[in-house]
Structures are given as structure tokens and as C-alpha cells.
């Protein structure tokens, strides 16, 4: 099995190119592999063009496509969807029953009610705009307070960015200092597992509330 997040991979935010997507499908076909395509942030795109899903490029029914409502409806709505060949779906159904029987009926009913009465695409559009403004605010703060000291991936979507600090800089210690100074980072040890880099979420931040912690390389 191949597990991949082709759109805004976590944590670095890399998006798989169209050519690489076709190569991955060809590789799966050649070796008889199942591809698990996880796309929790695919619909939170600020710029650029959406690329075809791996599932749409699948020619042999090998791709299981996963989507999530938690990023586009309600954060606490921990449900999503699966797109796969019928033979795979029947097996997944059996595994689901063995794992936890079923998803919350109330959550499924709430999502179904929303989808029956609202246009999901129209609902997502203002979210993309709001996230784009928050993203630009945090990038402006980085450019203002950490000029030429922090590099970030070129984020075209998703509600967080991946920052890389200078060589020898302990990102974990820095995040802990920020937590003490600003009371903003709740789990710094989870945000900066690899020394020198950190994932900076901004979904809950208002642009004017973004902190400006002291940075001393």
C-alpha cells in the first residue's frame, strides 16, 4: 500500500505535481499496490490551480480517496467521505464495523442536512478568502520580525505553514519560549518535533492578534 497526502502534505505543505501523480499511479499499477489518497486540506486552496485527484487518474480501481468535512464545515465534525471501487468499499465497510461499528449518527445527520440545503462550493469560497488573509498576516509578521532568518514553504493552501530556522537553531525551545511569552502555543512539543523546523497554524488567529515573539538566532 502507498499512503500519500498529495495536496499540501503535512507538515511541509508540498503538493504533488501532475507528472508525479501519473508516475505514482503507474507505479501502483506496475506493482499491484493500493493507494490511500488522504486529502483533508485539498479544498483550502488560496492560489494556483487544483490538480486532478489520484482517484480521478486511477485506471485499475486501486485508489482509495479520503476527504474530510472538519476543515470546511466545523472543526469538531470529525467525519468525511471515501471514494473507491465497489470491491474496495465493501471490504472497508467490514473493517469499519470491526473497528468502531459506525460514525456518530448525529454528526452524519448534521452534515447531511447542511449538504441538502447549501452549496458546499459556495460555502468554501469565503473560507478560502479568510484563510488567505490570515496566511498573509502571518507571512507579513515573519517578514517583519524575522527578515532573512526564517524560510517558509510556498504555501498555496491549508491553514498552517512550515517554517525552517537557521542551522543550529532549536525550534522546540523557541516554541516553548513563545508559549510562555504569549500563551499562544498550547503544545509546542508537538509543533516542532524536528529541531530547526516548525509547523505554524493560523486557523484560529485573527490577523491583528498574531504575536511578535523575540527571535535571537
Q: Where does each model-flagged region fall?
A:
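PLP-dependent class I/II
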Residues: 1-217
